[in-house]
Amino acid sequence: MQLWTRIRRYPRLGLILLAFIAFVALGLPDGLLGVGWPAIRAGFGLPLDALGLLLTSSVAGYMTSTFLSGFLLARVGVGRILAVSCTLTGLALLGYTFVPAWGLLVALGVFSGLGAGAIDAGLNTYVATHFGEGLMQWLHACWGVGITLGPLIMTFGLSALNTWRFGYRVVGGFQLLLGAGFALTLAAWSQVPATAAADAPQRLTDYRTPLGATLRRPAVWLSVLLFFLYVGAEGGLGTWTYSLLTEARGVDPTLAGFFAGSYWFTFTLGRVAAGVVARRVGVNKLVLGGLVGALLGTGLLLWNPGELANVAAVAVIGVSIAPIFPALMSGTRTRVGDRYAANTIGMQMTATGLGMAAIPSLMGVLARQFSLEVIPLCLLAIYVGLLAIYTLTLRGPGATVAA
């Protein structure tokens, strides 16, 4: 009751809570697919690597809506975008559970991606504009909460109800309720003054740097490559952990679901902890330390001395990589210079979509060609590459010039 009174007295508190809940909801579908995929492909009679089609369709929708987000935010408003996008995502996820053919499910993936991309871009832009850097860290931690709960919801549906559809119906229904919440608060979203945080640095969007000038800088492409590889590895392990453990290593499905959930659970804890120590530790130590930890965890997953080693491996990888994405994003201006940072950030977000689609899909192709045991080898190669590329960016001209 006291919380509701405070929300009515301070509307911004209500918007913050709604934004946090929305990011929990944004993470839920990402956590469902990895655990649910073996049952989905069995139901539709699909090969192992057919997952790439669904990933590609959803990422295509995601990239389209994020690319258009600035145009839409200026003309439609964030409240309407969030209400429509949550509703669209909810309907698409519910549609997964009713379509009779795999091709229709893939088509619905486009609409799921469109909604998710608009939610992601809309809330990131809104929180950065109105609430500053601190709340942005907690916002992304909420995504980790969602992607941690996703495997647990799907595991319950598979073990207790013997269906993958339960998970998507729960999450789809939640998205529809969230869409209604945004629709009921449209006025509040438009009333909050668009003032930047008091402690914000000079805005990167103040620079009117031509895109062509940005594209000519090697440091920019190295920075974009970092995001492509990092997000691909993050999504690759999240997508294939359950299949690796159940189909290649004979782990009990319920236990494997717990292992998959532990990856995102430790990922979330790592991101929360990193937000506390980031100012003292610094961006470079967070990235380098995270990559070293990821290599150790991947080595343990590759070694595979026993079931407990599997859960320890995915947990170590999760907590290690957690701070890398926000640290890389924060360090963009240092790597490429202030004048090129705004354009580079947009390119980096595009690279995350491409990486999330391409790398897990490629892992699936290799797993089908050889075996699922190729997944840890792929991760090892990616993390070694990330460490080499990031070290190179520290020595390049973009690391020292803030033009």
Language-model segment annotations:
Residues 64-103:
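Conserved MFS/SLC helix-loop-helix module at the cytosolic interface between two early adjacent transmembrane helices
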Residues 65-78, 270-282, 367-368:
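Helix-to-loop junctions at the C-terminal end of transmembrane segments
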Residues 40-41, 72-73, 153-162, 245-246, ...:
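Interfacial helix-cap and linker-helix signal at transmembrane-aqueous boundaries
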Residues 338-372, 379:
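A late C-terminal transmembrane helix in Major Facilitator Superfamily
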Residues 33-34, 217-261, 265-268:
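Extracytoplasmic gate region of multi-pass secondary transporters
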Residues 108-143:
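Cytoplasmic helix-loop-helix junction between adjacent transmembrane helices
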Residues 45, 77, 98-103, 250, ...:
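Helix-breaking motifs and short loop linkers at transmembrane-helix boundaries and internal kinks
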Residues 139-190:
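Helix-loop-helix hairpin linking two adjacent transmembrane segments in secondary transporters
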